[in-house]
Amino acid sequence: MKKIITLSAPPPSQFSFLSEFQFSLPELRQIQFKSYYYFIYKNLISELNIFPEIFDLNQEFQFELLNKEYKLIKPEKTTIKFHYNTYSSDLYVTCRLLRRKKKIEIQKQTIFIGSIPLIDYQSTFRINSVTRVIINQILRSPGIYYNSELDHNGISIYTGTIISDWGGRLKLEIDSKTRIWARISKKRKVSILVLLLAMGLTIKQILDSVCSSKIFLDFLKEKKKKKEHLQSTEDAMVELYKQLYYIGGDLLFSESIRKELQKKFFQQRCELGKIGRLNVNKKLSLDIPENEFFLLPQDILAAIDYLIKIKFGIGTLDDIDHLKNRRIRSVADLLQDQLKLALIRLENSVRQVMRRTTKRKRLLSPKNLITQTPLIATFKEFFGSHPLSQFLDQTNSLAEIVHKRRLSSLGPGGVTRRTAGFQVRDIHFSHYTRICPIETSEGMNAGLIASLAIHANVNNWGFLESPFYKISKNVKEEKIINLSAGEDEYYRIATGNCLALDQGTQKIQITPARYRQEFLAIAWEQIHLRSIYPLQYFSVGVSLIPFLEHNDANRALMGSNMQRQAVPLIKLEKCIVGTGLESQVALDSGNVMITKQSEKIMYTDGKKISLLNNTNETVNTHLIIYQRSNNSTCIHQKPQVISKKFLKKGQVLTDGAAILKGELTLGKNILVAYMPWEGYNFEDAILISERLIYEDIYTSIHIERYEIESRNTNQGPEKITKEIPHLENSVLRHLDKNGLVIPGSWVETGDVLVGKLTPQETEESLRAPEGKLLQAIFGIQVTNAKETCLKVPLNGKGRVIDVIWISKKENSSNYEKIIHVYIAQKRKIQVGDKVAGRHGNKGIISKILPRQDMPYLQDGTPIDMVLSPLGVPSRMNVGQIFECLLGLAGYFLGKHYRITPFDEKYEREASRKLVFSELYKASKKTGNLWLFEPENPGKSRLLNGRTGEIFEQAVTVGKAYMLKLIHQVDDKIHARSSGPYALVTQQPLRGRSRRGGQRVGEMEVWALEGFGVAYILQEMLTIKSDHIHARYEVLGAIITGEPIPKPKTAPESFLLLVRELRSLSLELDHAVIFEKNLNIKFKDV
């Protein structure tokens, strides 16, 4: 049995003082749970509290919600996975109807107003039995931000941008002539005096309040010269309305102008919210109450003063990309927005019903006024179509956790991938310990999709925090404090490498530290804080990469992304070299079952575990058996306990997908060699041994779901039956008497899974007398139904593991039933599959060699995988070499290693010394001197499997942890003989799902021209593409064996071009010039 050795620190005697600081990693999904808890206990109540009182047209009746009297019903435990149900809680609120004048209560009822989706134990939402997750959005925080920019003349101007809680913006700017404007659109601006007057101030109040009244006096003089009067609030509102909405002509003030400005301008651009008010007060040194959420005139006056100071060099500009100016919109904020929208819709619905009922003089009651549709429909729309509500990535357990910890700058109120510039995407110094600088998407979303650092947390204000150790002269008084991005700038923070220093040497050592956006080397006495963990700066995915510090950041990014694409294998194996976080990821994923208290195992089998708790109650825990994930991988739990055994709280009961004995296991430890082999590993191609196939090393299970609906049509209901005419019995052999496939059957491509007949009208030719005569003569049976069976698609063969029949939904007109058929496939690794390591070293399987032909070690062990040595130097991911060599030593020593990255903090070349020392131990213990050869450390001589000769040069050989990715050739391979054509161009469609063709573009044509294959090129551009007549002629020629005729007419794409030109009134014509006409004079032509 192998033992796990942790090599994350030197012997304890060197820094025994650190034993005082025992800490554990935070729960990796707590951002989801904490935020939803805040929504239920805070935001839900606050939204119900602001629901207004509603009156009828005569102001006689009053309807109101008693906000303190509400309850959420605990949902029943049902198998929602298969029945299109949503895991939600019914919300009941007490409503009251009373007479307004006398305040007499007419009726009081507790009414069901809708359902609120609940978060489950895996921090996900089940909507229509589909697992979804709400990802967090990072946005610019509401408040005021000062910046300098260039105007259209290239002159530098200073601006102050006020961002409202709704996302609207009001920009104040001071130009080169020291005039202050309020910009209301890209092309329109008004004087700041107009805005202040429209907000209710008088000219005297404005002049008395600002520090530089000369600016406003100059503006008033300019208005007098133009004979424009601007003395009152009404005049200013008219002026503002003209600039915003009015087209032309004279305009007089009216109350409708005030209401429209209030609704469309002030509410959208001047409502700061709680966080905006906090930021404005802090920036402008104001003491306005925190419950004043709207922008006040004194806010504008203070903002103007600060803008003038910046103009004259006093004050500081803001960095808009700093994390102190950005906040997280988590589950609570997004759901609160939807609840607010639903209650507005409910308010409008109640008002309409109330007015309609009183107008018809019918009896009013709270139950008749309330409808559940607004709340249910709003949440359904949000979870179904909102860009931040996404299908949970369930490829493996790591993919689930990373998806739940994702941060997105996209979505409503955020940036777009086309307009986002480099500054928004770039790494910012304030991301340190809060947002991972490595893990992000590749392509258009680079820098816009990020991941939380492993210790980062979101506070109640929506700002990212990170923990630090506070340094004290007395070591026992040191403690952990959480700081947000703006707070840590005032401290000198030592980086993670100082943790390994001895307490006695720290006082005289120069330590690298971070202070005010710079990295310094200062004495230890000047340090205020220090990091708590070397991996504190990185996300979960990056933290699982061993020897991370030896990799280029781009390859670490690819490695972290590809770990999320690893397919769970049938035979699991722990990595020999890891970082120690594998168990934390496995436990926090929610895919393993753990004991909630001290319990005794009474019974266990493959489907359930029976537990006896402290109160002598037997609790049956049912396991997840061969369940399909969102990514068509297999979720399967196996018990890891035996009967009659006592367990403590928190112990693991089961394994899950890609989880073995409580640790994340994404791949396999296999023997790799870095060497070229007859060109088969050219350009990242990979050569593998047949052992990986025959011993099911990389075999995985994939479950596909096929769906068919049975509806009521105009001709009658569709019928599920086994009796399908015109189909052979061989394709119907797996159907039962009801027309459904029998679970456990092995089905091949083309086999019928569900037999279905759709009614249709009989053709007119068969209803005529001559048609009936032909039926009688030839015995033709007239069928009035069309076969629309569900069949196994191409590459869909496998074992049917389940058939689910979902009954008719309520309140649905033409919906009858849905049938789901689940087919499991066991896929072995094959040519075309993608494999990768944890260091961004990826490749495609190019050839599978027999074991006897593979290069082999000096003890006769054949190599499992041959990688290209040219894939290491240029990519600069040397961590894979350290991993495979240490893995080889661990394999022969029977050890597993858990290594914290950045071990060079202990001494120079620490990783190299560790690897070589372990290889030396392995060679001594096993007697295999080739494991460590002093002249070629880390390399050994290999023998050619075909000839038995020793290769000329020593080869790097080791045990690497390689992953099989979800990009598999079975899902991608595609061929087309015939298929659908586009209606306009008559060319084959595009894409595998449409049975499309391969595009031959401009460069492909050049390549074929270069090889001189004229006939192949002509066929590709005409017969195989869009020449309609030639297609039919070629088919006939092939059948009869005649030579393929040459096309005599133009292809359809040329005819399409002619039609397009005709639509532009251009006509193409052609003329033949004979030899006798060549002497025609030029002027005649």
From Swiss-Prot:
Cellular compartments per GO CC: chloroplast; DNA-directed RNA polymerase complex; mitochondrion
Pfam families, alphabetized: RNA_pol_Rpb2_2, RNA_pol_Rpb2_3, RNA_pol_Rpb2_6, RNA_pol_Rpb2_7
Subcellular location: Plastid, Chloroplast
Catalytic activity as recorded in UniProt: RNA(n) + a ribonucleoside 5'-triphosphate = RNA(n+1) + diphosphate
Cysteines paired by S-S bonds: none
UniProt enzyme class: transferase
GO MF annotation terms: DNA binding; DNA-directed RNA polymerase activity; ribonucleoside binding
InterPro entries assigned to the protein according to its UniProt record, in alphabetical order: DNA-dir_RNA_pol_bsu_ext_1_sf (IPR042107), DNA-dir_RNA_pol_su2 (IPR015712), DNA-dir_RNAP_su2_dom (IPR007120), DNA-dir_RNAP_su2_hyb_sf (IPR037033), RNA_pol_bsu_bac (IPR010243), RNA_pol_bsu_CS (IPR007121), RNA_pol_Rpb2_2 (IPR007642), RNA_pol_Rpb2_2_sf (IPR037034)
Keyword Chloroplast: yes
EC number: 2.7.7.6
GO BP field: DNA-templated transcription
This protein's UniProt keywords: Chloroplast, DNA-directed RNA polymerase, Nucleotidyltransferase, Plastid, Transcription, Transferase
SUPFAM superfamilies, per the entry: beta and beta-prime subunits of DNA dependent RNA-polymerase
Free-text function comment from the UniProt entry: DNA-dependent RNA polymerase catalyzes the transcription of DNA into RNA using the four ribonucleoside triphosphates as substrates.
Similarity annotation: Belongs to the RNA polymerase beta chain family.
SUBUNIT field: In plastids the minimal PEP RNA polymerase catalytic core is composed of four subunits: alpha, beta, beta', and beta''. When a (nuclear-encoded) sigma factor is associated with the core the holoenzyme is formed, which can initiate transcription.
Protein name per UniProt: DNA-directed RNA polymerase subunit beta
Name of the encoding gene: rpoB
